[in-house]
Design a protein with these regions (language model features):
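Bacterial N-terminal signal peptides that target proteins for export
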Residues: 1-9
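Electrostatic cytochrome c docking/interface patches
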Residues: 29-53, 65-69
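C-terminal motif of bacterial Sec signal peptides marking the signal peptidase cleavage site
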Residues: 18-21
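Periplasmic/extracellular electron-transfer cofactor-ligation site
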Residues: 49, 53-115, 144-153
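Axial heme c-ligation environment in periplasmic c-type cytochrome domains
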Residues: 104, 110-130, 145-170
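Hydrophobic helical h-region of N-terminal Sec-dependent signal peptides
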Residues: 10-16
């Protein structure tokens, strides 16, 4: 009787093992957690477009054109900054500097107590940031340095680099 019980247990264990190996695994495989690269966006370009929108980069770096509804981005000059052909603000700087701030109609040049600021060209062209390294870009944003060069002058108002520096390196890359 004892031998029958051992044989029965062995056969049962063998059957269970065989059935468990032959049965179709219907359990859903958990997909490996992907590192959230690009903030959940499908590409680095889409992530960059999102950051430009949220950061308001084109508010100052894309010249505006006037319409019946007010200023709108001139998409033909997207992120080109205050371009070479645009006139400098024609104002009495001493009066402006004592009273506050003046902004041009294109919203790409500002006059204030610090002097005159012109928004930079952020296009991928060599006249913009096309020749910058990743390090230059991070230095400009994190340290507020002109052209991303540590030994250069600070970025001028109204560039909000003090707020932008709070973005992580991964967000900025």
């Amino acid at each position: 009787m004892k031998n029958k019980f051992i044989v029965l247990c062995f056969l049962s264990a063998t059957c269970i093992f065989i059935f468990s190996q032959c049965s179709e695994n219907t359990a859903t495989k958990k997909e490996p957690e992907m590192k959230q690269k690009f903030g959940g966006f499908e590409s680095q370009v889409k992530w960059g477009e999102h950051l430009v929108l949220l950061g308001g980069c084109s508010d100052c770096h894309t010249p505006k054109k006037m319409t019946p509804k007010g200023p709108v981005n001139d998409e033909t000059l997207f992120m080109s900054g205050h371009t070479e052909g645009m006139p400098a603000p024609d104002i009495d700087r001493k009066e402006v500097e004592s009273k506050g701030l003046v902004v041009t109609q294109t919203l790409t040049a500002w006059v204030g107590p610090w002097g005159i600021s012109y928004s930079g060209n952020l296009t991928p062209d060599e006249t913009g940031i096309g020749t910058w390294t990743e390090s230059n870009f991070l230095t400009a944003i994190k340290e507020g340095k002109y052209k991303g060069i540590s030994a250069s002058r600070p970025l001028m108002p109204p560039m909000p680099w003090e707020q932008m520096k709070k973005l992580s390196d991964d967000e900025l890359k």
